[in-house]
């Protein structure tokens, strides 16, 4: 909600070719999508690819999800919100294929932190006859980093829970009180208000 420049553009296909993708810092044009006239056929092909259950050649679901992301971002069919939609479809496809852990990965944060590398992977793919190996490689690394972030988060939360549980053994205190005792234990000079 409230992520588009103009909320009336939600879900609307482009009706012209007055669109370019710019680097948010330098404002350099990094991508000019194909003509809006190609959008109707693209949508048919895109939906066929997305929903293909019996392909002639196997494409691993993670790779297919990345290709879905690339296809939508490359075509840029919507007036606004193409990047967010591409990432959302990637997540949705992964969940549809049974990769439930994807729901807990923050790939968007990794892309945000490495926006220039993300854009370069796109540019290299375009410059090399749409060889999306660059984009796939970037996204696999982003998935790996996101997974490591999730592992570290779980490790921190598990350790915090373990420490709080130790203080719960004191008796006659609840979990919130145990957390406060833990804060004082770890930082004796901490001032809580």
Give the role of each language-model region:
Residues 1-193:
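FIC/Doc superfamily catalytic core
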